[in-house]
Amino acid sequence: MLTSRVTDLRGFLIGRLPVRIGLTQSNLDRAEEYLLDISHPKSPNYGKVWTSEEVIAAFRPSESAIEAVTDWLASHGIIDVTHSENKGWLAFDAPASKVEALLQTVYYEHEDQITGGVAPACDKYHVPKKIQEHIDYITPGTKLMAPVKSDVDLKVKREGQKNRRHDRVKQPAKQKFSEQLFNLLSSNSSDLSTCDVAITPACVAALYNITAGTLCVPNNSLGIFEAELQYWDQQDLDLFFANFTDWIPQGTHPIDEEIDGGIAQTDNISLAGGESMLDLQLAYPIVYPQTITVLNVDDIHYQTWENDTYTWGFNTLLDAIDGSYCTYSAYNETGDLPNWDPTYPDPGPDGYNGTLQCGVFEPPNVISLSYGGQEADVPISYQKRQCNEYLKLGLQGVTFVFASGDSGVSNYPEPYGFDGPTGCLGPDLNIFNPTWPNNCPWLTNVGATKVYPGFTVFEPESAAFDPGRVNYSSGGGFSNVYPIPDYQKAAVDLFFQDHEPGYPYYEGLVPDADNYTLPNVTALAGNTGGIYNRIGRGIPDVAANGDNIAVFVGGEFGLSGGTSASTPIFAGIINRINDERLAIGKSPVGFINPVLYEHPEVLNDITNGTNPGCGTDGFSAVPGWDPVTGLGTPNYPKMLELFLSLP
């Protein structure tokens, strides 16, 4: 955020500053251990999910840290200090002169050159060395700086072009097809002979051996995240049900959870969203009679925000689920990040005029999210703070299922994407460009497969590739921010041992950084000539069908696709498994990756196809895990049997 100094606050020493001190959390070095303890199938504590109170207690700052900081404040005459409910904050108001003496600094008012807002800040502040280890962040603190330019910005100068780095993982491309094809598909909705042309619910059921659902266990509604004006409409749902799933009654619709001004539904069929209709029309045939809850976040102003750093409202969702996240301090960042996240109340004409919703609803056990961007375009601290929250919710039994992206090992090239002419990184624009937020190790991310022309649902699928859709292929690769997690290491090691990709590589992870610093992949790769990171978290974990999906949008029949389609399929299957476990008194499955990597036999291994990008063929789908289709596609009966066998 660009700022300019406006007023020296030394002229207003009688004024009071609201000060918040974010305390360093304890036990973050044990977070992975805690999560694996309840999610690894060999652990005696498998399935013993934590409460939110237990999570707060496990990571709260130590008593010695709290005592050290409060004693330091008291030595400067600051005694009236409040300790936040989430235990991560100390808060007090004090005269500006006293705060300046405490921190050995001078406060000024700084004006945001973008918004015109004015806030107190300083150029630097001092904390005694013995106190530093206990403090993560102090606000008001140093003025916020503009984001470091990305690799692509350094190479490609865009004149007069808006840089929408965080384009949806893939805007489902709804292709219109002939009335003859529609009549053929709808006249016999159980016909499997045309699944290489169009994927219907019958095709999905046949591919993954999914039986009809019978359970509707309370408090197990499947969560589907939507943003970017992706509204659902009843008319399209009813058209789909009538033609392809006549066992689902007309009028069946999701529950709307509208967060901070979000709008989930429209009565205007012309405003129906391709993403939302795709998600619902894939998920309903799998989970029905179980319900679906649409989680729509942020007001119209932010959903159409021209600021290219809007990050889909994931933090808005997490704030609404976990109130402590609203003020959670980590990696020198506290709460939502200005100019990246919305600020509420929003007084604009389309704004949500209420306060930020914090901890207002219980999360679904499974949440499907078909949105995202590129890892290199999101601040390091922002990513890691958010990733911590996914882990904490995993401890509470929540499964997050993300799409892996639709442009292979790169982003879409211009003009379809906004990471330069190749969609790749580095000075030569040839370094692979992994996606976010599915780079976080505590999520399950889903690649895409396809029934190739001339093949049937009774034969193995292949990795999705459709050159007619801007070279759409299954997103995959290796993170530059996170290391290979323990649960994945054996599978990744075997991939490199048996299926060496043959490309030059580099090894390293970007260091932690403050505020708006982006991952510098050029510096990370150095002079190695490498085009991918050999030691990063592998993407994706699993896969499901993601091309030629039959869908109704805006009253019209067409075909759609993307990992946006694969994700609700896989999430729906996990939700079905939760129904079965909950019905017999067991916990939801929560973080599923350790179980799947320990038991890859419950998935259909995909061994054909690639995910091209950056002037290469990308990686190849091979026996075992690979960075194209992960461990493979779901086999519902095998997965159900396995998860029911666990405590």
Give residue ranges: language-model regions.
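An often Trp-containing, charged/polar helix-loop segment at the C-terminal end
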Residues: Y516, G529, I574, N578-T629, ...
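Substrate-binding/charge-relay-adjacent region of secreted/lumenal peptidase catalytic domains
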Residues: M1-T82, A91, A96-F402, D406-G408, ...
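C-terminal substrate/ligand-recognition segments
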Residues: P540, G561-D579
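Histidine/acidic-residue-rich catalytic or RNA/ligand-binding cores of hydrolases
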Residues: P413-Y416
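Active-site environment of divalent metal-dependent phosphoester hydrolases
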Residues: V409-S410, Y452
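Polar, glycine-rich mid-to-C-terminal structural blocks
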Residues: P441, N445-F495
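Active-site glycine-centered loops adjacent to acidic/histidine catalytic or metal-binding residues
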Residues: G405, G562, G630
